Amino acid sequence: MLKSEFHYDLPQNLIAQSPLPERSASRLLCLDGATGALEDKSFRDIEKLLRPGDLLVFNDTRVLPARLFGRKETGGAVEILLERLLGERLMLAHVRASKAPRPGTWLALEAEHRVRVVERDGDLFLLELAGEEPLQTVLEQIGHMPLPPYITRPDTSADLERYQTVYATRPGAVAAPTAGLHFDTELLGRLRGAGIDMARVTLHVGAGTFQPVRTENLEDHRMHAEYCEVGPEVVKAVERARGRGGRVVAVGTTSMRSLETAASGGSLRTFSGETRLFIKPGFRFNCVDALVTNFHLPESTLLVLVCAFAGHRETLAAYRHAIAQAYRFFSYGDAMFVTPNEPAANR
């Protein structure tokens, strides 16, 4: 399929610039991929959409304050966006400046911290932090929350809490797994009380999640690599849900990609390593039965994923409905509850 087949026009005023006062107060558009039927609901209605014995799978990655500001030796301003931690003082990062810094040069950061440009690797730079403090500590001191590029306001202290899920425990992401932002502790407690099981995978979301498909033909697109982990407790939880007739509900595209990476052989197994899984129409789903997800950018790999799961025509019709009904889009926006166009292969 072609990238242009996943385009839609979105009014700029529908791009949410800030979160709602309450996490679970968002709207929820339900899409039945088998029929194309749509229902407008509140996110709190997810309690009624889930059944006892269902399994919610969350991504427990924690977003690092991964945006740094500084200056080159010549005085020019630079902006650094961490892509991945490679060690206590090494990172792979995007560097935005009027002119790309050369290997061997130093970049001055806030609070008298400095990083040295070690080498360039395509669009990314290998940077080394000077001194003895671990990079993660320095990020916590002077880093800014890496809000997506379509959020045009400066980050604030409120984003340190709201651009983070309430269950985030494993630092490493530079973008939030945004479907999880709608769950607050009260809602999670009610779901547990209703007999909904829960499990956690880890996928450290990279900045590449915001990159568009760069080739017209989807088959030619190469996905960015992200670290993910599916532990034995997740495998057991899925087996338990299957045994009780429950569904595996992925909270977010990152949870779905983690599960389907680990189930690529046909059945779910433990997994730890990099994934470049690009889920597109024609993909054989082996694990996930339903998906909670936000609305995604036109021509993005994430929109392609939802189309693969719920159907291309059905998904784009749902997006047109969401626009007509003034849903809020993207990271701080509203959500969808999606059931598949076809059931998972192993059901």
From Swiss-Prot:
Signal peptide: none
Subunit structure: Monomer.
InterPro entries recorded: QueA, QueA_dom1, QueA_dom2, QueA_sf
GO cellular component: cytoplasm
Predominant subcellular localization, coarse grouping: cytoplasm
Pathway annotation from the record: tRNA modification; tRNA-queuosine biosynthesis
Family: Belongs to the QueA family.
Protein name as annotated: S-adenosylmethionine:tRNA ribosyltransferase-isomerase
GO MF entries: S-adenosylmethionine:tRNA ribosyltransferase-isomerase activity
Function comment: Transfers and isomerizes the ribose moiety from AdoMet to the 7-aminomethyl group of 7-deazaguanine (preQ1-tRNA) to give epoxyqueuosine (oQ-tRNA).
Enzymatic reactions: 7-aminomethyl-7-carbaguanosine(34) in tRNA + S-adenosyl-L-methionine = epoxyqueuosine(34) in tRNA + adenine + L-methionine + 2 H(+)
Cystine pairings recorded for this chain: none
Enzyme Commission no: 2.4.99.17
Protein's cellular compartments: Cytoplasm
Organism domain of life: Bacteria
Keywords assigned: Cytoplasm, Queuosine biosynthesis, S-adenosyl-L-methionine, Transferase
SUPFAM superfamilies according to UniProt: QueA-like
Biological process according to GO: queuosine biosynthetic process; tRNA wobble guanine modification
Pfam families (UniProt xref): Queuosine_synth (PF02547)
